[in-house]
């Protein structure tokens, strides 16, 4: 259970403006600086980075754009609507600075990601980090290790 459940976050942001997207529309573009924080109200989006599909998000209350906002850098992934999608949208810097409920939710989400990366790192080191593993795998493991230690992402 999260400190701020997605359903509670949805109730909290219901006064934010909404934006509707058609299938195929880009919500977040890698390399761009939108300055926006999006909260999925309904629909389904696909996330990819550098042409690699990372997954599909269809959970109402999912947050998009938080990493770019927190790190003050361009988005690192593309997010595209896979179905008709509606998101709440707000200025990321303002919300993260002034709204403790949203900031706490983002912190929990990021902590969960670091936890998953840590588990993945341990599993990679157990299975593929020893003798006989390719140099590329070893480099990827080290990059992931640095990301976990620094609290960031690879």
Please report, for each region that a protein language model flagged, where it lies by residue.
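Cyclic nucleotide-binding regulatory module and flanking cytosolic helices
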Residues: 1-25, 98, 102
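Polybasic "coupling" helices that flank or enter modular domains
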Residues: 82, 108-154
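Glycine- and acidic-residue-biased ligand/ion/polar-headgroup-sensing regions
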Residues: 24, 35-51, 60-62
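Conserved short histidine dyad/triad with adjacent acidic residue
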Residues: 17-32, 57-60
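Short, small/polar residue-rich loop motifs at catalytic or cofactor-binding pockets
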Residues: 13-14, 31-34, 51
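Cyclic-nucleotide recognition modules
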Residues: 14, 56-115
């Amino acid at each position: 259970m999260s400190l701020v459940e997605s359903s509670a976050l949805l109730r909290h942001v219901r006064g934010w403006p909404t934006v509707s997207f058609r299938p195929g529309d880009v919500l977040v573009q890698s390399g761009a600086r939108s300055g926006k924080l999006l909260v999925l109200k309904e629909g389904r989006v696909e996330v990819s980075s550098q042409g690699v599909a990372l997954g599909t998000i269809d959970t109402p209350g999912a947050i998009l754009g938080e990493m770019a906002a927190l790190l003050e850098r361009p988005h690192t992934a593309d997010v595209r609507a896979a179905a008709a999608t509606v998101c709440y949208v707000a200025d990321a810097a303002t919300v993260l600075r002034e709204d403790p409920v949203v900031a706490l939710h983002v912190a929990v989400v990021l902590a969960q990601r670091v936890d998953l990366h840590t588990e993945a790192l341990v599993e990679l080191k157990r299975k593929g980090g020893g003798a006989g593993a390719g140099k590329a795998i070893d480099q990827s493991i080290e990059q992931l290790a640095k990301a976990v230690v620094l609290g960031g992402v690879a």
